[in-house]
UniProtKB/Swiss-Prot annotation:
GO CC field: cytosol
PROSITE patterns according to UniProt: HISOL_DEHYDROGENASE
Gene assigned in the entry: hisD
Keywords: Amino-acid biosynthesis, Histidine biosynthesis, Metal-binding, NAD, Oxidoreductase, Zinc
Name of the protein in its database record: Histidinol dehydrogenase
CDD domains assigned: Histidinol_dh
Source organism of this protein record: Legionella pneumophila (strain Paris)
Amino acid sequence: MLTIKNWQLLSDNDKRRCLSRPRDNSAIKENVLEIINQVQLSGDKALYDLTKRFDRVNLQYLQISQEKIRQASIPQNALIAIKQAIETISSYHQFLLPENTEISTASGITIRNVYRPIQKVGLYVPGGNKTPLVSSLLMQAIPAKVAGCPIKVLCTPPDAEGEINEHILVAARLCGIDTIYAIGGAQAIAAMAYGTESVIKVDKIFGPGNSYVTQAKTLVAIDADGAAIDMPAGPSEVMILADTEANPEFIAADLLAQAEHGPDSQVILICDECELANQVNQQLEIQMSYLSRIEFIKQSLTNSRIIICSNQSEQLDIINSYAPEHLIINRKNPEPWVEKIVAAGTVFLGSWAAETMGDYVTGSNHVLPTSGFARNHSGLSTLDFMTRFTVQAINQEAIRNLGPAAMTLAELEGLDAHANAVQIRLNTLGD
């Protein structure tokens, strides 16, 4: 079960270790670079070869036909659930859609903010046939659709027969995606970043993945010929702040829900007293007995812990220092805490706010910054699928009134051609 640490008894070094995250020490950068180079050099052939090597699949084709997308069908209960999720996710991301605005900063000057959809976006959904991560697709495809991105490309790993799970195909169809490739891993990221004979080169790549996918996204993002990415990615995590009135059964369930993501996931509980910590550990043992992903959970819990800390100021310091992907405030009166949180991917308030709901159906996006990146990154939103540029209108009055200031600043920086561009206009205006 989870190790229990008393915060007040820890040294500063022990406190840092207590909040440290599991690290992937595998040296994969060179392997990923090799994959990227192979895709750049050999295009489609590399994709077929790499899929055979990593997925053990002899693909007959890379792109899923329009007929297969149209004919895909799933059980009615799954279809209803997907449509319900689409409705809430669409509502929230429509709410985030920005409006073009205009301001006059001085007499004769107006500046407009103009938003445009990114023209070509690449969506990556990991998992393959056994675990169709429909929610991951919805969280990317819906804001892309709301933003108005005209070209949306989906890459996801094939099953043993080289096909895509029909739940993914149906969800993609409902979200208006008709360009789907049966490609996974780092090779999928490389294909979308650089393009091949079959795969469209995109402007920005979205979506989670394993360490190879994450490394590939990082590498293509720093290449001027590659593609931008949504955000740095890492293992899933949750931090729960609970008081003595919190239900230990609920707490344990939320911890396990995050732990089952993978062996490198991390869960941390902050609570006031040791009694609740022990009750949660008991519940973890009970609930683990009937869950299916037990090996992932066991490994994840070795990276995780319970922190006993009753000082509210210190509790806030822990939260803001850790900057969790998911924060659950399971306290009697959670709302006042929100004003003091400065770093979190998303915050759930109260006993009934199961993190699972946010993963699927509240409408908020579940693609969130991990590994402490919530200090300087936000969760995925409609804005991530858009660009903004300014439109500046400047008339004669503005040149006359502010031109001399612009010239002075240009000359201060030794840029006489800058100053000249204004002086010529002032000369034309005369006195």
